[in-house]
Swiss-Prot record:
It is found in: Membrane. It comes from Arabidopsis thaliana (Mouse-ear cress). Its EC number is 1.14.-.-. InterPro entries: Cyt_P450 (IPR001128), Cyt_P450_CS (IPR017972), Cyt_P450_E_grp-I (IPR002401), Cyt_P450_sf (IPR036396). It is a single-pass membrane protein. The gene is CYP71B13. Disulfide bonds: none annotated. The chain crosses the membrane at residues 1-21. The keyword Transmembrane applies. Keywords: Heme, Iron, Membrane, Metal-binding, Monooxygenase, Oxidoreductase, Transmembrane, Transmembrane helix. This is Cytochrome P450 71B13. One of its GO terms (cellular component) is membrane.
Length: 496
C-alpha cells in the first residue's frame, strides 16, 4: 500500500512538472533558473541584483526569464538583446512597471522617470527636451556651474593648506546639490534655511526608492509586509518632507519676484498655460514631480561619478599622471578654467568614459513593462512582462570588452563609441525614449570639476594607506555609489 502511495505522489508531482514545462515550451519563453513556490526567483537576486543577473546570464544566455514573486520578468544582458528592447521594439517596451513607492513619491506618477508611456508622458517629455535640456539652456547655466566649482576649489585649497583629509563622496555630492538648487530653484543652498532639509530629502528619498518593496511583487500580502518592515511609514514621512521642501522652494521663488531664469520659473509658466502642453492640464503636483526627477538625477549621478573617476585615478597612478599632464599642458597658466577647456582634453574624456563603463551609476535600469506581446532574440515576451536592462552585464562582458575588469582609458582611443545612447556597448544613461534627458547638464559639471581637481592639485592617500587599500565595492540602491567613502589629501601645487 505504501508503495502505491509513493507511486501516486510521484506521478502527481511529475505531471505538474511536465505540465509546467510544456506550457513554458509552448509559450517559447527565454530560458531561466528553476524557481521556488510563491517567491519564484527573488531569492537569487541577492543584495546586488545587477551582479546576480549577470551571473545568471552567463549560465542561461542573453535573455533570462525570471518569476519575481508574482511578476513575470525578463533580463536583457547583451548589446544585441538590449538594442531590441531600447531601439527595435522601444515603443512596445518603454512603458513602466507600476512601483508602489516611486508612484507615491512622484505624486502618483506625475513625473517622467516612473510614469507609464502615454500621451501625457510624450507631451511632457517633448516639453522638457525642447525647453529644459537644449544646448542653449545647458549653456545658460554655465556661470552657475563655474561659480560653484570655483567655490568648491577654494574649499579644497583650504583643506590642502591644512593637509586635511577630504571626504570626496560627501563634498562632491554637496557640490552637485548646490548647482542643482541654483539651476532648479534659484536658491544658494549653503547657509540657507533649506540646507539641512535638502540633505534629509535627498537621503530619505534615495533610501525609499532603493528599498525592496514587497508590495511590488506580492499584490495583497506585500502591502502588509511593507507596513511590518516600516517601509510604508518611511515613505509617507519622506513624501511629506519632500513636498514641504518643494513648497518652500516655490514660495521662495515667488517671493523673490519670480523673475529668475531657473527651472521652477519655466514649470510655473507651463502651469499658467504660457507654455502649451496640448490637451493636458499641468498642475502644481506635476511641477513637483518634474522637480523631483531633476533633483534626484542631478545630485547623485554627477557627484558620485566624479568620485568614481577620482577613485580609479588614485588606484592607477599611471593614468593619473597622464591625465594631469594633459590637463596642465592644455590649460597652461590660465587663472579661470571654463567649460570650453574640455574640448582639447581627449584623454580626460576617455578616462570619464572608462569610469562610466566600469561603474555606471544605474547598472540596472528602472524596469520597463511590455505594453504588447513582442518577440526578442527568438523568444516570446508576453504583454505585462517586466523587462530589466542590465547595463552592468554589457559593460563587464568579455565578448564585448577586452579585459573588462581592467581600467584602461586607452580602449576608447581607436573607436567612436560614446555614451549618448547610440552605441549599445556603452549605455550608462540608457537609450531610446527613456534615455536620461539631462546628459549634457550632468557631463558639463563632471568635466569642469575634474579639470579643476586635476589641474590645481596633486592627490595622495591618508597616512598608512596604500593604493591596494582603496576599495572598489559599490553600494546598491536607486544608484550605485562607492560603498566606502573616498578620502584623499589634496596637495598644493604651482597651479593652485
Amino acid at each position: 500500500m505504501s508503495l502505491w502511495y509513493i507511486i501516486v505522489v510521484f506521478v502527481f508531482f511529475a505531471s505538474i512538472f511536465i505540465a509546467k514545462n510544456t506550457r513554458k515550451t509552448k509559450k517559447n519563453l527565454p530560458p531561466g533558473p528553476p524557481r521556488l513556490p510563491i517567491i519564484g526567483n527573488l531569492h537569487q537576486l541577492g543584495s546586488k541584483p545587477h551582479r546576480s543577473m549577470f551571473k545568471l546570464s552567463e549560465k542561461y544566455g542573453p535573455l533570462v526569464y525570471l518569476k519575481l514573486g508574482k511578476v513575470p520578468s525578463v533580463v536583457a544582458s547583451t548589446p544585441e538583446t538590449v538594442k531590441d528592447v531600447l531601439k527595435t521594439f522601444d515603443k512596445d517596451c518603454c512603458s513602466r512597471a507600476f512601483l508602489t513607492y516611486p508612484a507615491r513619491i512622484s505624486y502618483n506618477l506625475k513625473d517622467l522617470a516612473f510614469a507609464p508611456y502615454s500621451k501625457y508622458w510624450k507631451a511632457v517629455r517633448k516639453m522638457t527636451v525642447v525647453e529644459l535640456y537644449t544646448a542653449k539652456r545647458v549653456k545658460s547655466f554655465r556661470n552657475i556651474r563655474e561659480e560653484e566649482v570655483a567655490s568648491f576649489v577654494e574649499f579644497i585649497k583650504h583643506s590642502a593648506s591644512l593637509e586635511e583629509i577630504v571626504n570626496l563622496n560627501q563634498t562632491l555630492v554637496k557640490l552637485s546639490g548646490s548647482v542643482i538648487c541654483r539651476v532648479g530653484f534659484g536658491i544658494n543652498l549653503e547657509g540657507s534655511k533649506l540646507e539641512n532639509t535638502y540633505e534629509e530629502v535627498i537621503h530619505g528619498t534615495m533610501e525609499v526608492l532603493g528599498s525592496f518593496a514587497a508590495s511590488d511583487y506580492f499584490p495583497v500580502i506585500g502591502g502588509i509586509i511593507d507596513r511590518i518592515t516600516g517601509l510604508h511609514n518611511k515613505c509617507e514621512k519622506v513624501f511629506k518632507g519632500t513636498d514641504s521642501f518643494f513648497d518652500h522652494c516655490i514660495k521662495h521663488h515667488l517671493e523673490d519676484g519670480g523673475s529668475k531664469d531657473d527651472i521652477v520659473d519655466l514649470l510655473l509658466k507651463v502651469e499658467r498655460g504660457e507654455i502649451g502642453l496640448g490637451e493636458f492640464q499641468f498642475t502644481r503636483n506635476h511641477t513637483k514631480g518634474i522637480l523631483l526627477d531633476i533633483l534626484l538625477a542631478g545630485v547623485d549621478t554627477s557627484g558620485h561619478t566624479i568620485t568614481w573617476v577620482m577613485t580609479h585615478l588614485i588606484k592607477n597612478p599611471r593614468v593619473m599622471k597622464k591625465a594631469q599632464a594633459e590637463v596642465r599642458e592644455v590649460i597652461k597658466n590660465k587663472d579661470n578654467i571654463t567649460e570650453e577647456d574640455i574640448e582639447g582634453l581627449e584623454y580626460l574624456k576617455m578616462v570619464v568614459k572608462e569610469t562610466l563603463r566600469i561603474n555606471p551609476l544605474v547598472p540596472l535600469l528602472t524596469p520597463r513593462e511590455a505594453s504588447k506581446d513582442v518577440k526578442i532574440g527568438g523568444y516570446n515576451i508576453p504583454k505585462k512582462t517586466w523587462i530589466h536592462v542590465n547595463i552592468w552585464a554589457i559593460h563587464r562582458n568579455p565578448n564585448v570588452w577586452k579585459d573588462p575588469e581592467a581600467f584602461i582609458p586607452e580602449r576608447f582611443m581607436d573607436n567612436q563609441i560614446d555614451y549618448k545612447g547610440l552605441n549599445f556597448e556603452l549605455l550608462p544613461f540608457g537609450s531610446g525614449r527613456r534615455i536620461c534627458p539631462g546628459i549634457g547638464m550632468g557631463m558639463a559639471l563632471i568635466h569642469l570639476t575634474l579639470i579643476n581637481l586635476l589641474y590645481r592639485f596633486d592627490w595622495k592617500l591618508p597616512e598608512g594607506m596604500e593604493v591596494e587599500d582603496v576599495d572598489l565595492e559599490e553600494s546598491y540602491g536607486l544608484v550605485c555609489p562607492k560603498k566606502v567613502p573616498l578620502e584623499l589629501i589634496p596637495v598644493l601645487t604651482q597651479w593652485t
